[in-house]
Amino acid sequence: MESTPETSSTDAISDSIRAILDRQKKAHIDEGPASVKRRKDWIDRSIALLVDNKDEIVDALTSDFGNRAPVASLMTDVMGSVGPLDHAKKHMEKWMRPEKRKLQFPLGLLGAKAHVEYQALGTIGIISPWNFPFNLTFAPLAGVFAAGNRAMIKPSEFTPACSELMAKMFREAYDETEVAVITGGPAVGEAFSKQPFDHLLFTGAGSIAKHVMRAASENLVPVTLELGGKSPVIVSRDSDIEDVAARVMTGKTLNAGQICLAPDYVMVPEEKADEFVAGAQKIVTKMFPTMKDNPDYTSIINDRHYDRITGYIEDAKAKGGDVIEINPANEDFSQQPYNKIPPTIIKNPTEDMKVLQDEIFGPVLPMKTYKDVSETLDYVNSKDRPLGLYYFGQDSEEERRVLDNTTSGGVTVNDVIMHVSMEDLPFGGVGPSGMGSYHGIDGFRTFSHAKAVYHQSKAKMVAEMFRPPYDDKKRKRVLSMIKK
């Protein structure tokens, strides 16, 4: 099913999606558990799709964004998808093995046994976003396929060229009972969220996640929500500020900051503020001597998001903010074919500024200063728990203090974003930044049912322990086990 006409009635849209889901569920039952060979074949087909269509993927991303660095697209959406799939293929047999579990005394001595089996759930729904449309579809499939599941995918309507290509790719490589792509706008997304999947993965904005979770709850569908938030950067006094600025701005300008894990704001020692700005200007100039017509500098996805981000800058200016635009060639961005916004630092923003209230999701970086690191912890803990937190410093005690006294989905020390690329680490949020996780073995387990299996001892005395009559001997045995 490539598309669902938006003009169709809500019931008709839902029915057409449900028909595909029913066929997938029937195939899952009729064909029985997927063998290791079949799971690896599913993964191999996805890897082949990415490799064989890499040029088309880059072209589709460029078309949807208006301008997106081809090498960056290859790194994030192709290489960044092949890696998780290959990792799952190499390790799935180990993940699939039953896990022995311990038994209470004396059952183990009497021959009882217990283990956990990881069983495929069935059909996993995947709602993927526009910022990395291929990566955030294919990377979850690593865990989905490794666990022996089928998938139904709803890509974002904000990237129509990518969605169309994705539908074509999957249609050519998979039967619809294995993988199906459902394209369309909000009405399709709403109908998709209401389906009785065996698990639903949503990546996107928290405001939309509330609707998705509410819809899924009607069928008690478990959800994994990968959201975002305002991921802070805490810079220690003993840091190499120029290097810190370079790493932060590299992360902030990747995809023009349109990353759920992008550093949202930075907190630096007050005496290091000017040095950080100078370092940021230096690295941006090195990376992007020009920006307006530079294919390496990514556009903002659409007019709405462009207006939203420029609105943050204008709001900061109107409220007296010290706004520093990093524009090495002094280009005029008021007249341009693409929605590009130069990297912008807002020094010492005030709490009434929108840039400190909303997730930025763009190349704007508020910079707060502090006297003591305790101020940074208080500030982070006064906000919603973020998807990522970044600490720069060499003081192991201070690092431990930051990690112990803040809560975030994940942490990268002495860089930004990088923890998401470690396949053996879980990726997920906490609280408003998300729930659940995937990647590597954690993805395999998220998309599996951990089934407890117990084999009873053949010893008759085990069964006799629980049967009436409850004489004094049995009473004493029970009481002997109730102790501090």
Label the model's feature ranges:
Residues 28, 47-50, 54, 89-96, ...:
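Structural signal for hydrophobic packing residues in well-ordered secondary-structure cores
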Residues 2-7, 11, 26, 34-40, ...:
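Conserved C-terminal structural/oligomerization subdomain of aldehyde/semialdehyde dehydrogenase
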Residues 11, 174, 207-350, 413, ...:
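ALDH superfamily catalytic-core signature
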Residues 39, 85, 148, 179, ...:
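Residue-level signal for inorganic ion chemistry
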